[in-house]
Amino acid sequence: YIGNPNLNNESSLEANAFVAFKNERISAKLSSNYFHISDYIVGKVIGGLVPMTIGGKGVKQYGSLDYATIFNADLNTQVQLFSFLKWNSQFTYARGKDYRKENLPFMSPLSYRSALQFYKNKLSAEFSVFGNSRYRDFAAVYGETETTDYTIFNVNAGYQFSFNGMKVLTKIGVENIFDRIYTTYADWNKIPRPGRNFYLNLNLNF
């Protein structure tokens, strides 16, 4: 990226709306917002220049658009299945357009995250899944390309115990259980995210 100190500051108009529901076991909230941004700053591809970074596909310079519009929406839910078992989910979506109705870069496709959380005395465990749909509304004008969909599974378990007056929390887990090769819409040059990995955490509270 090449900077540009002569750009005007962005200014925006924003509208928000949400609806929510909650009882003893279930809570849900659907929210959305809309932005109309004047002098929107974005990186524009410059032709004829060779990138210095190995693997780079072009050089961009920051410039401003007359205006851009961005719409975001998200749904959050929580269900208390049992006293020891909770289910959380989140769905998010974003869409952006410039003043020429071209797609804006770095707008998240439909993404989701869901987790089952178990708590019983000093034992805890979680099974989670997250992912993105295919990135079809990419901003080709601004140098973006399509990104495939993916779904990633994780699991962990923890236990808390006392030792010589200290509280010790241990947690062991596996991320990306099925060793899926994936990249997100925001990753530079489509460099893959980490594959299957194992971790062990040990927290000591004196």
Go through each PLM region and give its residues.
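Generic beta-strand structural signal
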Residues: 21-22, 118
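Outer membrane beta-barrel strand-and-loop segments of large Gram-negative receptors
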Residues: 2-8, 14, 23, 27-86
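Small/polar-residue-rich segments within soluble enzyme cores
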Residues: 18
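Extracytoplasmic loops and strand-loop junctions of Gram-negative outer membrane beta-barrel proteins
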Residues: 1-4, 13, 54-62, 96-99, ...
